[in-house]
Amino acid sequence: MVAPLAEVDPDIAELLGKELGRQRDTLEMIASENFVPRSVLQAQGSVLTNKYAEGLPGRRYYDGCEHVDVVENIARDRAKALFGADFANVQPHSGAQANAAVLHALMSPGERLLGLDLANGGHLTHGMRLNFSGKLYETGFYGVDATTHLIDMDAVRAKALEFRPKVLIAGWSAYPRILDFAAFRSIADEVGAKLWVDMAHFAGLVAVGLHPSPVPHADVVSTTVHKTLGGGRSGLILGKQEFATAINSAVFPGQQGGPLMHVIAGKAVALKIATTPEFTDRQQRTLAGARILADRLTAADVTKAGVSVVSGGTDVHLVLVDLRNSPFDGQAAEDLLHEVGITVNRNVVPNDPRPPMVTSGLRIGTPALATRGFGEAEFTEVADIIATVLTTGGSVDVAALRQQVTRLARDFPLYGGLEDWSLAGR
């Protein structure tokens, strides 16, 4: 019971050490990833992992919950206060679990769901045919304008009037612009639908006022706690009080059994951090970094190489890069950036002719680098490196760029001394 991981399971300890090294010495630019603070790591690696706590605070199906009840109430209160919501459920294990609970609370199987098409930036849980949301419900989709790559609210309204959904979704996985929540609310009211907003990607920006809040407009809002919010991987549901009972029942017993109390403790810590001036500064640098990247990738030398930015820029923490007119496909560009030490993910772009495992685009995000402390100068340097890779292709000096990336990463150390604490048991 007291032996450290390195002694009990050296194979896993070695792999954890290697992953720590990878995170330290590369530049993480996957838009859905971030680095949690050590305080969150400590909470999620705590003795709370031992406790079963089915039910809600004060109404558990297990004894011995007097302390975890307080933990969960703190997390719920912090979530409500941070986002100005009537109620919060902090039990979902993930964003997908949160989304499933929302749909089960608001709809019955066979009813109609309208969301952003996956090929235009939507999420799997917004009605993709192979996902539970596409199997249980009749799904319809709206897309983006073929020229501007923006969501046309007149087109959304027309589709909603035609399709008459029970639930209208506003949210995305790869869309670089702010959504018009008031317009979505108006359309939902016109067709008699409930409005669900999935703010998983931009919740951190909402928390500090850098992005409009969907909470005043939506019936229910779901989010992850990682991504821009910077906590551990998990989900969260907010909304109007009238939906609290249905949401709570859809989470437990509808979707899950016992909540992960160690993860809920980590959520509570992350939600407290989100109220600090340091967190606001981080979100400001996240947004500034994305705009620096978008500006660099719309410069003449980059566009001459056939690279473009979807919608021409960004309002959020990510840039969606279109490579259809360049020598690259998404997989090849991802692989070459990986060689120089920058981690991104290939992503479909609107009207993408390539299959999803290849794609014609990249989704590049700035939250993790902002968390490390990157500012304008560093984001400018990173943007130049990415531009060099995408414009020079096979002739790029990988070794030189890798050295530059390693220097940048080591200028902003990550988790100093963590291997001693996490692997050796100190």
Curated annotation (Swiss-Prot):
Native source species: Mycobacterium leprae (strain TN)
Family under the similarity heading: Belongs to the SHMT family.
Function: Catalyzes the reversible interconversion of serine and glycine with tetrahydrofolate (THF) serving as the one-carbon carrier. This reaction serves as the major source of one-carbon groups required for the biosynthesis of purines, thymidylate, methionine, and other important biomolecules. Also exhibits THF-independent aldolase activity toward beta-hydroxyamino acids, producing glycine and aldehydes, via a retro-aldol mechanism.
Localization annotation: Cytoplasm
Location (main, coarse): cytoplasm
Site feature: Plays an important role in substrate specificity: H226
GO cellular component: cytosol
Cofactor needs: pyridoxal 5'-phosphate
Protein name, per record: Serine hydroxymethyltransferase
Pathway the protein acts in: One-carbon metabolism; tetrahydrofolate interconversion; Amino-acid biosynthesis; glycine biosynthesis; glycine from L-serine: step 1/1
InterPro entries registered for this protein in UniProt: PyrdxlP-dep_Trfase (IPR015424), PyrdxlP-dep_Trfase_major (IPR015421), PyrdxlP-dep_Trfase_small (IPR015422), Ser_HO-MeTrfase (IPR001085), Ser_HO-MeTrfase-like (IPR049943), Ser_HO-MeTrfase_PLP_BS (IPR019798), SHMT-like_dom (IPR039429)
Domain of life: Bacteria
Gene that specifies this protein: glyA
EC number(s) per entry: 2.1.2.1
Modified residues annotated as N6-(pyridoxal phosphate)lysine in this record: K227
